Amino acid sequence: MTTGKSAYGTRCVDLEVIESTDHETCKTELARLSKGLANPTRIEIVRMLYKKSPDRKYICSDIVDALPLAQASVSQHLKILKETGWVYGENDGSRVRCSLVGNIMEYYRELIKKAIQE
């Protein structure tokens, strides 16, 4: 259901694939993505990344600085967001730049619609 890989995950999801996805696969995919949002801190990280201009990425340390959490906690939340398909990262020297997976908000919305309609 995704296209475009980086070292730390998928860069973009293909919205057209939802049309041909069966209902059970759709529910499984929706559950996977929902797990990523199952914590208020992860929702805040997604919100921060969503508000960022698409051509600019957060350095992971910027996210740590913006949240009242230890670096290890933020890293754990970013790891879960990557594993569940919300975020990808790219190496930039000694730093990792984080961004939302392209089309992920629309993809999530369409999965919800399809899961409810069928």
Predicted feature residues:
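N-terminal leader segment of winged-helix/HTH proteins
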Residues: 1-37, 84
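Hydrophobic alpha-helical core bundles mediating ligand binding, dimerization, or RNAP-core interactions
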Residues: 27-31, 105-116
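N-terminal helix-turn-helix DNA-binding core of bacterial DNA-binding proteins
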Residues: 28-70, 92, 96-103
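Hydrophobic side chains within alpha-helical segments
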Residues: 45, 79-80
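Alpha-helical residues within the helix-turn-helix
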Residues: 65, 76, 82-83
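Residues in the helix-turn-helix
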Residues: 73
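Base-recognition residues in the alpha-helical recognition helix of bacterial helix-turn-helix
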Residues: 76-77, 94
